[in-house]
Amino acid sequence: ELADAYRKCMDKITFTEEDGKEQAEQVLEDLGIDGMGLVDSDRTVWFPNGACSERNGLGLGSDALWQGDLDRGLPGYLYCFSKSVEGITSVPDGVVAEETVDSYVPPFQVETISILITEEGIKYFKWDGISEEVCTVTENTKLLPFEKIQAKLTDQIFYWYSGKGQSANDTTALEYDVVNAKLQYTYTTAYQEPKHAWLVPAWIFTVRESIGGNSLQELSYVINAYDGSVIGEAY
């Protein structure tokens, strides 16, 4: 019932997602921020101070979502931007990878900007992972053949399955299906510069784990498109 109330509130948005996107992009332009591309957008509800216990007023991603006063909430769109190279955006969130010998955890998260737009205008702005581009290490690098990337992914899925400790007598068959694959950019530790990061092309895979057709969870893997190394989460 409460979820339906939130959906009805969000259905009252008076502008299109594209119109909101143009407003968010105008904010970036006005601030002189370039080199960012849209990676995600979603409907949400913004609450003013005192209308929701969550500090940022978004009412997202926690139990505080259900404590907001919808009579005071404003529906809108939340836009997430990240570093973009020739139209290809970066991974906005850290992704957990199995700890293997060729796993490289970036020293800090990918730079992202989140902007919430309502009918009253901008209600939320957050800039995470602010960074400075020092130099370009190399250009026009050759990517690893996709067949080798697939082999790396298969290894990672096997490591995950092996970690479950399923006994030899257990006949339960776990299924792993790749439901999404996308080429993006992300950070990896810079060679001999542990406090710096390289922005590198990477394959982002979403793998669905299921039993007998019943989905259990979705797993995310990030594999460096240049050398096949596994990239872990920035903590």
Where are each of the predicted segments found?
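Charged, low-complexity helical/coil segments in non-catalytic cytosolic or luminal regions
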Residues: 105-199
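C-terminal structured domain segments
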Residues: 189-195, 202-214
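A short, surface-exposed beta-strand/turn
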Residues: 90-126, 211-235
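Generic short beta-strand segments
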Residues: 81-89, 184-186, 206-210
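Preferential activation on post-signal-peptide N-terminal prodomains/segments
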Residues: 1-105, 131
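Conserved histidines in hydrophobic membrane contexts and catalytic metal-binding motifs
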Residues: 24, 115, 203-205, 228
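Glycine-rich, flexible loop segments associated with nucleotide phosphate handling
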Residues: 9-16, 173-177, 197-201, 217-218
